[in-house]
Amino acid sequence: MIPKKTKLKSREIEVPGDKSLSHRSVLFAALSKGKSKVTGFLEAEDPLNTMSAFAKLGLKVQKVKPGEYEFESPGKNKLVSPNVDLDFGNAGTGIRLSAGLICGLPGINATLTGDNSLKKRPMGRIIKPLSSMGASIVGLGEKETAPLKIEGKKLKGFRYESPIASAQVKSCLMLAAISSETDLEYSENILSRDHTENMFRFLGNKIEQISPLHFKIKPPYVLNGGEFRVPGDISSAAFFLVLGVLAKEGNLLIKNIGLNPARTGILTALQSMGAKIEIQNKRIECGETVGDLKTYPSNLKKSNIPESLIPSIIDEIPILSVAGFFAEGGFEIRHAEELRAKESDRIHTMVSNFRELGIEVEEYTDGYSFDGTSKKSSEVWTRLSTVKKIPIQSYMDHRIAMSFLIFKTLSGLDLQIDETSWIETSFPGFEKLLESCINE
């Protein structure tokens, strides 16, 4: 087995606010006439870019203190066309959800763009159903990618059966229907995250739930603003969960984490591998389940990850793969082709980096696998422990960079990650917090 070297300080930590909820708080604040307030807002590049975009549409923004903002909107029907392109940077959630909202606003003309990574990500998955609602939206890049040119108009009611389990597609269409005061019937084959539905209900709206995978919404919609409290992001906590369960000693108590049932797949996956993680102080805040997570040093083993779990762990698969390297029996992920449409092609990026480390990895169209028997893992670790400056490519992807920083900490290997600035898109202060957990 790979020897456990990392000793942690037993301490409480907090991670930044949930990125998904931070984006959505801005969108609902813009839709709602009057004042809204958000605490726990993630002050990272992605949600701040969404905030900046809607400020250009007429949303007034005032920062009260770190993580706390007050918004004032003239109401969705009095938002204005921006005089510059709306730049979402690397925020796929921001551009897709905002596109839906803006499509349903008659008289608003806007071009939504982003960085080179975002311009490669698929937008046809929202363009097609939005167009069926009567939206005027065109992907100006190759293969219907960003920039997105939108001319807002009154949309028609729509029934959509999504071929993929995607909270972004679902939320995009919901926001289009809400902004245009029309009805939407939506169904999917596997349950995706329901943050938009929860925030929508929290504001006083009703959803007709036909089945767990099938719902309807219809006007009139309640859009009077509210006070949102954003919990810590479980996708960010995942890095410290893996650090905690693979440490030689020490316990981490990660406070105030969002435990939405559609997001806790990382807990299910890690616990099925033998991770000891305890949920404490579980409660409901602003329509979302929240709690504290305590980690204990654990011995991990290979576990089969079912297809039904993939949508709820899609962002955590890179760090879960790192845990797999330390697990007896290895690691396999399948039915995860959505990884190829993230900030990078995460199947390719993880496979290529693991191969750079000398790990024999089998790549599939929908995932990858590697053998984690004690002998092979130990041989790889023994060889690498004598190598200096092992190159790791982040591929402009924050989760790849953070995953291999955790790998570096746990393994003690001299990994040289090409660029870590991408981490700022979701987790400012990550490296400093990581260093503070280590007991030298």
UniProtKB/Swiss-Prot annotation:
EC number from the UniProt entry: 2.5.1.19
One record GO biological process: amino acid biosynthetic process
Reactions accelerated catalytically: 3-phosphoshikimate + phosphoenolpyruvate = 5-O-(1-carboxyvinyl)-3-phosphoshikimate + phosphate
Catalytic residues as annotated in Swiss-Prot or TrEMBL: 315
Matches recorded under InterPro entries: Enolpyruvate_Tfrase_dom (IPR001986), Enolpyruvate_Tfrase_sf (IPR036968), EPSP_synthase (IPR006264), EPSP_synthase_CS (IPR023193), RNA3'P_cycl/enolpyr_Trfase_a/b (IPR013792)
GO CC annotation terms, alphabetical: cytoplasm
UniProt keyword list: Amino-acid biosynthesis, Aromatic amino acid biosynthesis, Cytoplasm, Transferase
Protein origin, superkingdom: Bacteria
Major localization listed first in the record, in broad terms: cytoplasm
Residues noted as binding 3-phosphoshikimate in the record, renumbered to the chain: 19-20, 24, 166, 168, 315, 342
PROSITE patterns linked: EPSP_SYNTHASE_2
Positions that bind phosphoenolpyruvate: 19, 92, 121, 168, 346, 399
The keyword Transferase appears for this protein: yes
Localization per record: Cytoplasm
Pathway: Metabolic intermediate biosynthesis; chorismate biosynthesis; chorismate from D-erythrose 4-phosphate and phosphoenolpyruvate: step 6/7
A GO molecular-function descriptor: 3-phosphoshikimate 1-carboxyvinyltransferase activity
Gene3D superfamilies on file: Enolpyruvate transferase domain (3.65.10.10)
Self-association and partners: Monomer.
Function comment: Catalyzes the transfer of the enolpyruvyl moiety of phosphoenolpyruvate (PEP) to the 5-hydroxyl of shikimate-3-phosphate (S3P) to produce enolpyruvyl shikimate-3-phosphate and inorganic phosphate.
Family: Belongs to the EPSP synthase family.
HAMAP family listed in its UniProt record: EPSP_synth
Name under which the protein is recorded: 3-phosphoshikimate 1-carboxyvinyltransferase
Protein's organism: Leptospira interrogans serogroup Icterohaemorrhagiae serovar Lai (strain 56601)
